[in-house]
Amino acid sequence: MFEKLQDVLCYRFADVRLLETALTHSSYANERGTEIEHNERLEYLGDAVLELTVSEQLFTRFPEAREGQLTRMRARLVSKPSLAELARELKLDTYLLLGKGEESQGGRTRSSVLSDAFEAILGAIFLDGGYAAAGKTVLHVFSSRWPQGAEAARTKDAKSTLQELTQRLFKERPVYTLLGSSGPEHEKIFKVRLLLPDGRALETEGQSVKRAEQKAAGLALELLEGESA
């Protein structure tokens, strides 16, 4: 029954009953008796698996991104509308087990039902095959959804964004100074000082001068953007 869906998910269940439970809406279980499990507990688990996997991927893919930027990207990726769109692409609507009332009220196309089912499937994969298996499925189905182009560039180049902002606010550029380095040759840590045109300074460290400068620029952006908010 679920052969094609498992192919699409890039995962074969050892216990396919977990997948069936992930696709079972509470309305279906309620109409047929308490012995039938529905997907709400799996959805709870899958939500945590999804958030951790996406957080880990964004952290790795965008080493220069500030915490606020990572949070915004993650929020867009795991939002209910985004997950519902993904569920439709996977044709989860054709596999859902719904109660008659939910079916008649359009539950098969409802975004909340679809997004919950997708998260429940991740929870089911986690229970069946572990975190690595669930993470692999996330990477597979999200392969074309990671931030690209202008959005990715914004997260990577805090220095350019800061320069544009300081030019606009102060008509001057920030100044970066290398204060020194420490540690063994293969694990050097570089310390950088950033001086804003208004006289305020920030000091940061990084595994390269570039990373330290980007980190300083990111902190300065948060400072200046917070003041102008």
UniProtKB/Swiss-Prot annotation:
Residue span(s) of domain DRBM: 157-226
**GO CC annotations on file:** cytoplasm
Give the chief site where it resides: cytoplasm
**Domain RNase III: residue ranges:** 2-130
Please provide the record's keywords in A-Z order: Cytoplasm, Endonuclease, Hydrolase, Magnesium, Metal-binding, mRNA processing, Nuclease, RNA-binding, rRNA processing, rRNA-binding, tRNA processing
Top enzyme class, one word, equals hydrolase
Determine if Glycoprotein is one of this entry's keywords: no
What's the domain of life for this entry?
Bacteria
Record InterPro entries:
dsRBD_dom, RNase_III, RNase_III_dom, RNase_III_sf
Q: Where in the cell is it found?
A: Cytoplasm
Q: One Pfam family this chain carries?
A: dsrm
**Entry binding sites for Mg(2+):** E43, D116, E119
Which molecular-function annotations from GO does this UniProt entry contain? Answer: double-stranded RNA binding; metal ion binding; ribonuclease III activity; rRNA binding
State which Enzyme Commission number(s) the record gives: 3.1.26.3
Cofactor(s) of this protein = Mg(2+)
Q: Which BP terms from GO are recorded?
A: mRNA processing; regulation of gene expression; rRNA processing; tRNA processing
Q: Which PROSITE patterns match?
A: DS_RBD, RNASE_3_1, RNASE_3_2
Q: Which reaction does it catalyse?
A: Endonucleolytic cleavage to 5'-phosphomonoester
Q: Which NCBIfam families match?
A: RNaseIII
Query: Which family is it part of?
Result: Belongs to the ribonuclease III family.
Tell me, how does this one assemble? Homodimer.
Q: Which PANTHER family match?
A: RIBONUCLEASE 3, RIBONUCLEASE III
* Function noted in UniProt: Digests double-stranded RNA. Involved in the processing of primary rRNA transcript to yield the immediate precursors to the large and small rRNAs (23S and 16S). Processes some mRNAs, and tRNAs when they are encoded in the rRNA operon. Processes pre-crRNA and tracrRNA of type II CRISPR loci if present in the organism.
Name-wise, this protein is Ribonuclease 3
